Amino acid sequence: MKITKLEKKKRLYLMELDNGDKCYITEDTIVRFMLSRDKVISEEELKEIQDFAQFSYGKNLALYHLSFKARTEKEVREYLKKYDIDKNIVSQVIANLKEDKWINDGQYAYAIINTNQLSGDKGPYVLTQKLSQKGISKSTIEENLKEFDFSEVAQRVANKLLKKYEGKLPARALQDKIIQNLTNKGFSYSDAKIAFDDLDSQVDQETTQELIFKELDKQYTKYARKYEGYELKQRLTQVLARKGYDFSDIASALREYL
């Protein structure tokens, strides 16, 4: 077979043969096989050219995708799937990129965890979930998590939460709120509890009284329409307890309020 045409089409070249066959190839393919118009190639050579063109095209696409930011093997595979590249070729591209250090799931995981240590607010459980979604293996994630101590991150987050909620919640509710937020962010309950215990959080009696009377004003208006006497007192006690107030503080406030 003879090459009758080599014409550039954006990032690829259109190669036409005298038997009517056409295929798109990369510039790397032209250089590798020293292709030119009127060159004669065999069926076997054509197959090699087509396979390498797919590989070269796939690698160029992957490198373009990686030029914006680091990505995992799974992310690159999914990107290449959009371009209908043969699965075997995709695997060859991935292997080549890993060999050249363009893809390294271990380094990716380390970088994400390290950034979180410096300025993030996530605990190990949430990080594990996020990295797993990126296709990183459980063993790779665990290996990298072992390199870090999350107590400083938990303490940093706990301090921010304290600033947000202090003076707005009674002591027990404040503890519950901070610990719940920390566990939602991926810290274990024990780490969350330690972080809270290390806080300089003192909800004084005056603040508690102010909060409980403010809450009583709101709840009394709601329940006094339906209840009175003992039943009203019970309803108010229940709702204040759910809000995190101690029963002794509730009883004291109700004696003064009712």
Swiss-Prot record:
Function: Modulates RecA activity.
Protein family per UniProt: Belongs to the RecX family.
Domain of life per record: Bacteria
TM region(s), chain numbering: none
Main location: cytoplasm
Biological process, per Gene Ontology: regulation of DNA repair
Gene for this chain: recX
Keyword Cytoplasm: yes
GO CC entries: cytoplasm
Keyword annotations of the record: Cytoplasm
Cell compartment(s), UniProt: Cytoplasm
Protein's UniProt name: Regulatory protein RecX
Keyword Nucleotidyltransferase belongs to the record: no
